């Protein structure tokens, strides 16, 4: 079916809403529901064949996230990530004013080291509620710290960065996808730090007490030391050959850079970890975020049906006809923020919103900066990812066991999200004007 069909697009959006409703109300896997709706709408209403809908399965993104999760899952299973976090906390026990920022660094480290945001957020939330809050840190500062592990995961090999990089490449920006992903990671990191600092002063994080009774963490085991070395080696080969190719060039470095794709390196790293007996492979495989992968696949398939029905044309035409060019990044941020408020953040929202970007750039005659528009979608989804109705926010709330604190969290987390969206909107508007 060619052209634009507004009715089909509306049906797809209803399908997304129903998938979210069925997930929250009946605990039905959102990705499976979305796949079913993709088949119903694609085959019965658009005249597609079943194999056409199956072809919309996001194989590249699915494979990337799986490979990353398998490799970095070794460090989660054998306790390497936990020991790294505890050692960083122990270092600040006599400097209580540094506790919040050490937790922030732990969050970034967990994200950069490949820990998936829900798992990293859960680790950070446990530390926040068991160490920071008893020391006088406001729970809402701890909520803002969740943005550190999310932003850390935007690094190219991170759980979210792999999705961002792959989806940007799918939109016709394959040559620029790597640079765009690094820029999005850098800007998101800066904005996240700014928001955490703002929350630190709003809720008086400088008044924290000294952490008492904290035992010195155990030293790294042989397996954990080997895991850290292996992670550093993988990161080295993922980054350095590309840098050398840029500055030196040559066929060997070009071929090496092509081979040193993060997903290939992660699979090689997983095999090496297996032979070094760093963790039980079956346990690592079981820890792989299969639910998130199925969710991502289902939403991507349903939104691909919507794209084929003309969703991108409808939204881009409305935005370009109604919104001034310099304000488009802000509205893309609002769109990402709204969608992420009730779903799984980047993994769900970015694949939905990313296809709009090329159409906006084309309709503007190339005056709009594609990276800024991709960044806008990421920041919007990023900041409302701590909404109490979103996965990240729900995980954070679930780690709290104090009923008196629980009463503040729902409205408080929404305030933190609002602060983030406003801050992100201001920065995006400036970037939209400057770039």
Give the residues covered by each predicted segment:
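Long, contiguous bundles of hydrophobic transmembrane helices that form the permeation core
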Residues: 1-9, 13, 40, 186-284, ...
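Hydrophobic alpha-helical transmembrane segments in multi-pass integral membrane proteins
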Residues: 159, 236-240, 299-316, 361, ...
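Membrane-core helix-loop-helix motifs of multi-pass transport proteins
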Residues: 130-220, 369-376, 393-435
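Hydrophobic transmembrane alpha-helices of multi-pass solute/ion transporters
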Residues: 2-93, 240-323
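Small-residue-rich segments of transmembrane alpha-helices in multi-pass membrane proteins
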Residues: 38-45, 97-101, 152-157, 292-306, ...
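Hydrophobic alpha-helical transmembrane segments
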Residues: 9-14, 32-35, 97-105, 119-123, ...
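Short helix-coil transition sites and intra-membrane helix breaks within transmembrane domains
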Residues: 26-30, 60-61, 73-82, 111-123, ...
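Hydrophobic alpha-helical transmembrane segments of multi-pass integral membrane proteins
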Residues: 94-135, 140, 146, 322-378
